[in-house]
């Protein structure tokens, strides 16, 4: 029985030593990274800084044209001088 307890204590000690060596290796790897890395910032953009034509079209579709004074059925009234071409939406 004493041999079993002693053997399991050695096995647990071996696992602990191995885990400590792995943890120390991870800490060394973190310190070997470039100094000042936490102060660096990077911005990534996948588009035109002023916006794309697709975004402009989506904004135009989201905002309906204001009703013209002569026709209450606007924004789709063909008689309105502004709404058929959607020039009343700012871009």
From Swiss-Prot:
Record's keyword terms, sorted: Antimicrobial, Defensin, Repeat, Secreted, Signal
Compartments, record wording: Secreted
Keyword Secreted: yes
Signal peptide range: 1-19
Pfam families for the chain: Defensin_propep (PF00879)
Gene Ontology terms describing biological process: defense response to bacterium
SMART domains: Defensin_propep
Propeptide: 20-65
Region (7 X 3 AA tandem repeats of C-P-X), start-end ranges: 65-85
Primary localization: secreted
Function comment: Apparent precursor of a secreted, cationic, proline- and cysteine-rich peptide that contains Cys-Pro-Xaa repeats. Unlike cryptdin, the proposed mature peptide region lacks the structural motif characteristic of defensins. It may have microbicidal activities.
Record family assignment: Belongs to the alpha-defensin family.
Protein name as annotated: Alpha-defensin-related sequence 10
Organism taxonomic ancestry: Eukaryota, Metazoa, Chordata, Craniata, Vertebrata
Name of the gene: Defa-rs10
């Amino acid at each position: 029985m004493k041999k079993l307890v002693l053997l399991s204590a050695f096995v647990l000690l071996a696992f602990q030593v191995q885990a400590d060596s792995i943890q120390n290796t991870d800490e060394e790897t973190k310190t070997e990274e470039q100094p000042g890395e936490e102060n660096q910032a990077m911005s990534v953009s996948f588009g035109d800084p002023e916006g794309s034509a697709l975004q402009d079209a989506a904004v135009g579709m989201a905002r309906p044209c204001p009703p013209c004074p002569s026709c209450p059925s606007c924004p789709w009234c063909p008689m309105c001088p502004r709404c058929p071409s959607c020039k009343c939406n700012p871009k």
